[in-house]
């Protein structure tokens, strides 16, 4: 595995972690909070984004405008049943969700959740490193690399990992700062 391939794989892993971070509430309303909500619509689980337009008219409100008004009740039910703890307000045409300010206790819970997502991201990055190093060792064993070349490749793989871990730590720090900001 070349360093560029490894970096591309690690970049994808980092982006997945960032998407997880985006689903964690901060003090502001954000339509990405609803990314993981699936609505049972005509017997099939459908992502909310496929059924409605999501917008944030102000910092404390998320507005959901369904493409098909008949799905309004199903969307409302899915949001109410989600783990987000939001109470949707249905006016017959749109659903509005008031995002209340976070309590200190809730902020700490979300920081723990962000740390958990970051740790999962680190594990994914380490797994990619392990796979890359295993390939290098196999190439050394097959005679494609000398021992010195193998060690150099392993060092470069480790440097790539270190770079991405630092980036992930920065993302975590930014997310925690956003969560704790009152």
From Swiss-Prot:
Region described as Disordered: 136-156
UniProt-listed InterPro entries: Ribosome_recyc_fac, Ribosome_recyc_fac_dom, RRF_sf
GO CC terms, sorted: cytoplasm
Function according to Swiss-Prot or TrEMBL: Responsible for the release of ribosomes from messenger RNA at the termination of protein biosynthesis. May increase the efficiency of translation by recycling ribosomes from one round of translation to another.
Family the UniProt entry places it in: Belongs to the RRF family.
GO biological process assignments: translational termination
Domain of life: Bacteria
Upper lineage: Bacteria, Bacillati, Cyanobacteriota, Cyanophyceae, Synechococcales
GO MF terms, alphabetically ordered: ribosomal large subunit binding
Stated name of the protein: Ribosome-recycling factor
Main location: cytoplasm
Keywords, ordered alphabetically: Cytoplasm, Protein biosynthesis
Location of this chain's protein in the cell: Cytoplasm
A Pfam family that the UniProt record links to this protein: RRF
């Amino acid at each position: 595995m070349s360093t560029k391939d490894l970096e591309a794989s690690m970049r994808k892993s980092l982006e997945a972690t960032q998407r997880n971070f985006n689903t964690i509430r901060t003090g502001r309303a954000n339509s990405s909070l609803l990314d993981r909500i699936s609505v049972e619509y005509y017997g099939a689980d459908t992502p909310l984004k496929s059924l409605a337009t999501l917008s944030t008219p102000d910092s404390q409100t998320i507005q959901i405008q369904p493409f098909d008004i008949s799905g309004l009740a199903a969307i409302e039910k899915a949001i109410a049943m989600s783990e987000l703890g939001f109470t949707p307000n249905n006016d017959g045409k749109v659903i509005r969700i008031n995002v209340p300010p976070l309590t200190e206790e809730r902020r700490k819970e979300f920081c723990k959740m962000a740390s958990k997502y970051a740790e999962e991201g680190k594990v994914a990055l380490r797994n990619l490193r392990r796979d890359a190093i295993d390939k290098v060792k196999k190439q050394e064993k097959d005679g494609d690399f000398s021992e010195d070349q193998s060690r150099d490749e392993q060092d470069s793989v480790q440097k790539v990992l270190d770079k991405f871990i630092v980036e992930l730590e920065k993302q975590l720090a930014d997310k925690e700062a956003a969560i704790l900001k009152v």
